[in-house]
Swiss-Prot record:
The keyword Transmembrane helix applies. Keywords: Antibiotic resistance, Cell inner membrane, Cell membrane, Membrane, Transmembrane, Transmembrane helix, Transport. It comes from Acinetobacter baumannii (strain ATCC 17978 / DSM 105126 / CIP 53.77 / LMG 1025 / NCDC KC755 / 5377). GO terms for biological process: response to antibiotic. Its main location: membrane. GO terms for cellular component: plasma membrane. It is found in: Cell inner membrane. One of its GO terms (molecular function) is transmembrane transporter activity. Probably part of an efflux pump system that contributes to adaptation to osmotic stress and resistance to colistin. The keyword Cytoplasm does not apply. This is Colistin resistance protein EmrB. Gene3D superfamilies: MFS general substrate transporter like domains (1.20.1250.20), Multidrug resistance protein D (1.20.1720.10). The gene is emrB. The chain crosses the membrane at residues 17-37, 55-75, 84-104, 115-135, 144-164, 169-189, 205-225, 234-254, 280-300, 314-334, 341-361, 376-396, 412-432, 486-506. It is a multi-pass membrane protein.
Amino acid sequence: MNKHVEAEWRFPAKTAWAIFAAMIFGNFMAILDIQIVASSLNEVQAGMSASRYEVTWVQTVYLIAEIIAIPMSSIVSRVLSTRVYYTMCAIGFTVSSLLCALSWNLESLLVFRGIQGFMGGGMIPTSMTALYLLFPEPKRSLPLVMFGMISTLGPAIGPTIGGWLTNNFSWHWMFLINIIPGIIIATVIYSGPNIDRANYSLIKSMDWFSLVGMAMFLGGLEYFLDEGARHDWLADTGVRIAFMVCVVGGMIFFSRSFTQPKPLLDLSVFKNKNFTLSAITTFVIGMALYGLGYMIPVFLGQVREMNSSQIGHVMMVTGIVMFCFAPFLAWLIPNFDTRKTVFVGMILAGFGVWLNSHLSIHSDYDFMFWPQIYRGIGLMICLIVVSHLAMSTLPLSKVADASGIYNLMRNIGGAVGLALINSSLDWLTAMHVTQINQSMTPQNWIFTERLDQLTAQYQEVGTNAQQIALSVIYRDIHFQALTSSFNDLLRMLAIIMFVTAFLTIFMDRGKK
């Protein structure tokens, strides 16, 4: 920070830690609930009697609501105060979690899931803002580590926890586990001191056109990115409407943000070089975090045919590594050049992704182990230290807006990454299937030998033995093509991460 930041405690240390601990646990629940349903969509689909497409909205509606709420949290927390706003979000998140578990059909679940996402989206940036308000500059390393640890741990272990709860109890418990912690968090925050003062006069000067424009822009963008890949982009009416809503909303929001004397969201933070480069970096981190959290479980489920518990067992390595390595960063941040630290972290994470890009149809836990180790350490370094670089050169008055934008960039990065993965996966798989099929000729002795073996194996079935053998071979071809497609995407992601690492050359060191 700069001269505006106080060097002394504004509150007793125990009070500051109690408030912050409650806030980051709420932050953990909000981030966890993004991915907790990922490994249990089949069970939710069966419970709600929904189609495979309809049930994907359980995730989509949460993300749309969350991505709208994140930047809005800045202005609302200034109007109501951080304490009151966070308490309202915690209560809303808890009540909506209960209602999700009590949903009587898919439509009601989606409504309550949207409320849950909106309330969770308010908690995430508010807890980052509180970090800078609660702790003096010399004492921020450990809180930053804890914040980063929670931000990465949620997506990493969400599918594991969701799969375990669903297999051992029912899918309803993915939401019921939020109730008791939510009540405790709301009580602790509301009973604590005011971190800042409410300013109700801001309501009179609030730019409501910008607010509507921002909601249209972000909601339309999230829908366009999430649903476009599934429906051939602008060929679908709903996706076209979302794109137009996004464009119109963006024109309203950005035009007013640069022309109004008191804009809804202060975009001048992008004039700060460190913040802009850090925002780009966290965008790529979002692509990696959410993209890998999607690709690896899909590979394990579709190609390796693992169930949700087995997938969770493989994926938990990353979460454990992140959790164990995070405390080390509290010592690393004040003692090393943070730019070099981010460079090493991004290269290490990219190296882990590159190692993962050698998947085969036989890849298992042992193959995934070391790539997850490197990736977990690298991503944890980047998430924590990049947030320090982004915020440490900004005045305290700009932190609320900056934290909302910074967290938004990571979420948009994740949405863009998932959209690119989904849209690329189909045509890459089709390309690899064509390439493999071209080699499946009578002159290919591997193909003919495999066909003869399978035909002999299925002779007992009857006269369709060769047809059954061919269907098995074509299934294996699809699995091989899908695996090759994942490898292509993983290599591209690794290259993007390697290139992004060099942005640190242009950053300032930032305050320790």
